[in-house]
């Protein structure tokens, strides 16, 4: 039976037997590769649009043809089943095409943050046994070019495919882009630099494979299809492998749910593909639903709403800051949102008042939806829990998507808690995460009533309706406005490595300009700092202990600094983090203004306070 017809049958079966929904879905998980799944979902709408970039649009028929052409290209490169190909790419049509092309031939796409530093790049390429690299031209210059000797001599990687924005643009638009931005042909410039490394561009990649015979990898149960990454407890992104079932299951859950996507035709794809929420929850879900994905390779928090209004995309998955920016600027007072059919946020929280204000704005500006929230984990390939904004209890993040099941556990007794009691969320899905990879145990599971559950590390409670309420993260990590996770202990250790620092505390504050959390630091200076300008000290710490730290990102930079004589402590002689969080900011702080986009940090400014107490240095 055709997949989409079977999905409709299962929806009716679940409606008639809601208490058995988990087992019904568990016994009917689609058996396709990622490539096979989107091909099956779209075989009857090949004339509909699949991708858009600038003025260039591709139908699903053209999209699948391109996947097949690129698959031939990788076969001609010598890429085989099981090979791992590192992708260092922003959201471009080529990025999506390449992912499915690799999946078609049974190779594994290893999606790495293109802003990763040199040492972290080496770490990923070696640890994850990469066989070849595909990277954006700008990323080649910043991250790959300097380690060419290493990747060939140490890792035996001898193939690098380079993509460019102009590869995706129509001829005239491509020429205009080259004129405006002085686009250089990196492929020509480096192709003979290292005789042992084959560096080439898309045109040669496709031309050299015109007569290549391509093998389509058949579906094999529990075969790893892709690798993404997420920050671990040390702040170092950890490897998250996913099977075809893991990736397809997210789309399957949405398709089998009661969410109506029939009016959604276009999806603004801004969440990055190296993260599961951009890969499974956005890219693969969108194509499984037959939507036109509008690819946005580079954006900033300041222009994301402008992009939404310009493209008139029907659907946007984003962070809370996107939507707070919409209601926080007078420039959008007259915005017409009549095109918006689905709006979703994750990676952070909104207060009940903030959510009400956003929904009031959406309704008054003609949007066809309310803002929907949910909860998920990268380890589960994204969303696990999703709300119906028209029916949910205020403050809830929703109920289980079909095929998911969560229970609240007391971590001390390991007993399930009653409704309304706080505990650790343990979660299970019809397609659970890969628990062991390359000989390493990634997750420990516990068996409860015949199902395997994983500790999410998040504190929640659940009501009698099955709705979940997120209360915090057990690890105490800070979730920035853009969803990036900061680990206070790791950041404190980095800053206190400076001889100018005696002690520090890291907390968070609400950043009104970004509509979300940002890191706040309390600093006690050491004797070595005497006589040195405070701006020089801060610059030294940022440059030498954060930006130069291989386990940190520019996103770890505290944007508010308080220099104090002593840190607050509780009566139990423990640092009082609760107090500094409650105190927040008062204008006496030194501000770090970071000029950043999703592709990296351009520069930062140190701004001294204009009011408050005079800073005292030891």
Residue ranges and their predicted role:
Residues 399-403, 415-446, 451, 467, ...:
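Conserved ATP/PPi-binding loop(s) of AMP-dependent carboxylate-activating enzymes
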Residues 248-266, 274-315, 329:
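Conserved AMP-binding/adenylation subdomain of ANL enzymes
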Residues 59-61, 216, 225-249:
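Conserved AMP-binding A3 loop
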Residues 175-179, 189-190, 194, 313-317, ...:
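Gly/Ser/Thr-rich phosphate-binding loop
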Residues 53-58, 71-119, 270-272:
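Conserved AMP-binding/adenylate-forming
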Residues 116, 124, 135-138, 316, ...:
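AMP-binding/adenylate-forming catalytic core of the ANL superfamily
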Residues 104-203:
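Structural core segment of the AMP-binding/adenylate-forming
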Residues 505-510, 520-522, 543-618:
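Conserved C-terminal "lid"/linker of ANL adenylate-forming enzymes
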């Amino acid at each position: 039976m055709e997949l989409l017809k079977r999905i409709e049958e299962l929806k009716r079966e679940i409606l008639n037997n809601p208490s058995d929904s988990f087992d019904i879905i568990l016994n009917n998980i689609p058996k396709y590769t990622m490539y096979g799944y989107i091909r099956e979902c779209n075989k009857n709408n090949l004339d509909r649009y699949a991708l858009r970039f600038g003025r260039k649009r591709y139908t699903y028929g053209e999209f699948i043809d391109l996947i097949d052409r690129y698959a031939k290209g990788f076969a001609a490169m010598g890429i085989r089943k099981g090979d791992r190909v590192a992708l260092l790419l922003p959201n471009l049509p080529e990025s999506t095409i390449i992912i499915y092309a690799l999946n078609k031939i049974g190779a594994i796409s290893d999606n790495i943050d293109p802003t990763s530093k040199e040492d972290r790049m080496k770490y990923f390429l070696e640890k994850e046994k990469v066989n070849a690299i595909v990277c954006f031209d700008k990323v080649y210059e910043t991250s790959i070019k300097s380690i060419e000797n290493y990747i060939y001599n140490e890792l035996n990687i001898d193939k690098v495919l380079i993509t460019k924005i102009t590869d995706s643009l129509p001829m005239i638009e491509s020429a205009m882009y080259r004129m405006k931005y002085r686009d250089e042909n990196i492929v020509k410039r480096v192709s003979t630099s290292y005789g042992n490394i084959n560096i080439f561009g898309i045109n040669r990649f496709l031309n050299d494979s015109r007569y290549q015979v391509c093998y389509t990898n058949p579906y094999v149960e529990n075969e790893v299809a892709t690798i993404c990454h997420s920050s671990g407890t040390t702040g170092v992104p950890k490897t998250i492998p996913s099977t075809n079932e893991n990736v397809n299951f997210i789309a399957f859950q949405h398709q089998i749910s009661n969410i109506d996507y029939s009016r959604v035709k276009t999806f603004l794809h801004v969440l990055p593909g190296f993260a599961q929420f951009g890969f499974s929850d956005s890219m693969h879900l969108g194509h499984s639903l037959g939507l036109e994905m509008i690819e946005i390779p580079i954006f900033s928090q300041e222009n994301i709403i402008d992009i939404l209004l310009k493209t008139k995309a029907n659907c946007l998955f984003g962070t809370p800051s996107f939507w707070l920016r919409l209601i926080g600027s007078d420039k959008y007072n007259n915005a017409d949102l009549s095109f918006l059919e689905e709006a979703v946020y994750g990676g952070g929280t909104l207060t009940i008042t903030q959510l009400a204000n956003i929904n009031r704005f959406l309704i008054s500006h003609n949007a066809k939806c309310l803002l929907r929230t949910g909860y998920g984990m990268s380890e589960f390939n994204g969303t696990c829990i999703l709300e119906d904004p028209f029916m949910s209890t205020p403050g809830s993040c929703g109920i289980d998507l079909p095929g998911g099941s969560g229970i609240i556990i007391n971590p001390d007794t390991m007993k399930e808690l009653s409704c309304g009691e706080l505990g650790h969320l343990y979660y299970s899905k019809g397609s659970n995460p890969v628990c062991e990879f390359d000989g390493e145990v990634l997750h420990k599971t516990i068996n409860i009533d015949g199902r395997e559950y994983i500790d999410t590390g998040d504190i929640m409670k659940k009501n009698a309706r099955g709705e979940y309420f997120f209360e915090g993260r057990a690890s105490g990590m800070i979730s920035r406005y853009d969803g990036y996770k900061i680990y206070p202990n790791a950041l404190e250790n980095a800053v206190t490595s400076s001889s100018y620092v005696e002690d520090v505390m890291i907390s968070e504050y609400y950043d009104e300009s970004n509509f979300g959390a940002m890191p706040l630091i309390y600093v006690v200076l050491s004797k070595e700092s005497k006589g040195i300008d405070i701006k020089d000290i801060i610059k030294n710490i940022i440059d030498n202990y954060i930006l130069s730290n291989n386990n940190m990102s520019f996103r770890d930079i505290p944007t508010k600094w308080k220099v104090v004589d002593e840190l607050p402590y509780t009566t139990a002689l423990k640092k009082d983090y609760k107090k500094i969080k409650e105190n927040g900011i008062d204008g006496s702080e030194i501000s770090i203004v970071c000029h950043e986009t999703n592709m990296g940090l351009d520069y930062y400014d140190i701004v001294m306070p204009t009011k408050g107490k005079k800073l005292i240095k030891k």
